[in-house]
Every structure is written in structure tokens, then in C-alpha cells.
Design a protein with these regions (language model features):
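Amphipathic interaction/junction segments at domain boundaries or subunit interfaces
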Residues: 53-176, 199
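Residue-level signal for beta-strand positions within conserved beta-sheet cores that form or flank
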Residues: 152, 191, 206
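Generic structural motif
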Residues: 132-136, 193-195, 213
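Beta-rich nucleic-acid/ligand-interaction surfaces
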Residues: 195-214
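N-terminal leader/assembly segments
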Residues: 1-91
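Active-site helix/loop of acyl-thioester processing domains in fatty-acid/polyketide metabolism
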Residues: 175-190
Length: 214
């Protein structure tokens, strides 16, 4: 049976990092004028320079990511989204994850550390998945094929993912999530951890699935 996240206390909202770090990443990659133009195109200009401390309507976040893809193309959108994910993870590590967890998890066996991290992610899934549903499927057997550097240990799934709901993309559209998850796993579980989105609802998948390996 997969582990499933608890329901969001405020349905349909996402934490402000999804916008704050996107702004920061786009400023660095394309410049502040391009960032402002993106927010205008997405109809989200009020979010452009606001301090943003409250939860944000997930539809606003989705429109920003859609505008990023449409205005800049998938290659640049992927690069910016991954940078925003890295910045989000860095913020969480610095301000949201208790110091004792930051110190002790890397000292645990990777499997044990992963289970602690995943439990915390499921408990707080409402902050990043909004009205989507998050589940984890653990690998029943870990086998590393000849020539492979890592083995898939688990799969994180966001069903009805709000970030790309209704999108039609020739590729993966949730690199923001993939980068955030990867940074957290590398810092807290295994330095070699990799997180790849292997299925996306924007590309016709039944869910946004992230394979976690190390």
C-alpha cells in the first residue's frame, strides 16, 4: 500500500516559495524586465514584487509556469524552474527543516533517512501540492543493473498536479518539483541522489511521477 499525504487545511493553495523562488530564478536568468513581463502575461502582476508571506492560489502559480513555458520555451523554462526548485529546497533547509534533522539525517543509513524525509514531505504536502494528492511507492526490491550507478528506491506521485493541470507539453512540466525533491534528498539522504520526473499529466500521464534513486 502506498503512503498517502494528509489533506490540505486550505484547499487549492501553495506556499509562497513557488512564486518567490521563481521570481528570483527568472531575474537571474533573463533579467528583471523579463520577469515583470512574465507576471503581466500571466495576469499576476500583483505578485511581482509583493513580499508574499501567505499561501497563494495554486491557479496563479500554474499560470506563471504556463507563461514561462509559452514565452521562453521548454528549455529555458526547465532551466529556470530547476533553479527555482534548488532555491526552494535551500530555503526549506535553512528555515523550515529543524537543525537537528539537518544534522542527524545525513548520519543515518540512507534508507532510514529517506523514510523520515518522506514522512515529513507527506505531512506537509499541502504546502507544495495544493489540491493535488501526493503518494509514495517504495521499491519492493532494490536491484542495481550492471553499469548503472544508482537504483530506484521509491517513486513520489502527485496526482492531479496543480502546477501543470490542463497543460499540454511535449515533455515533463514539473522540473520545479523534481529539483526541489532532488536537492532535499541529496542534502539529507544521499549526496548522489537523483530525482527524475518519469511521467507527467501535461504529457498525457496518469500522474506526475518522480523516480528517486541513489
Amino acid at each position: 500500500m502506498p503512503a498517502v499525504a494528509s489533506h490540505a487545511p486550505i484547499a487549492g493553495t501553495i506556499g509562497p516559495n513557488a512564486v518567490l523562488r521563481l521570481r528570483e530564478a527568472l531575474d537571474a536568468d533573463c533579467g528583471q524586465d523579463a520577469t515583470e513581463a512574465l507576471f503581466v502575461a500571466a495576469g499576476q502582476l500583483p505578485l511581482h514584487r509583493a513580499p508574499l508571506t501567505d499561501m497563494i492560489d495554486e491557479r496563479a502559480v500554474a499560470r506563471l509556469h504556463a507563461a514561462l513555458r509559452s514565452r521562453h520555451g521548454l528549455e529555458i523554462a526547465t532551466r529556470v524552474a530547476r533553479r527555482a526548485g534548488d532555491l526552494t529546497a535551500d530555503y526549506l533547509l535553512a528555515h523550515r527543516i529543524p537543525a537537528v534533522a539537518r544534522w542527524t539525517l545525513p548520519l543515518l543509513p540512507s534508507g532510514a533517512a529517506a523514510r523520515v524525509l518522506v514522512r515529513a514531505m507527506l505531512a506537509h504536502a499541502w504546502t507544495f501540492a495544493g489540491s493535488g494528492r501526493v503518494a509514495v511507492h517504495w521499491a519492493t526490491a532494490v536491484r542495481r543493473q550492471p553499469g548503472e550507478a544508482a537504483a530506484i528506491r521509491l517513486e513520489l506521485v502527485i496526482e492531479d498536479c496543480p502546477l501543470c493541470r490542463g497543460a499540454d507539453v511535449d515533455g515533463m512540466a514539473c522540473e520545479y518539483y523534481a529539483a526541489t525533491f532532488q536537492r532535499l534528498f541529496r542534502r539529507l539522504v544521499a549526496p548522489t541522489a537523483e530525482v527524475r520526473e518519469v511521467s507527467c499529466i501535461a504529457a498525457g500521464g496518469d500522474g506526475c511521477r518522480f523516480a528517486v534513486s541513489w
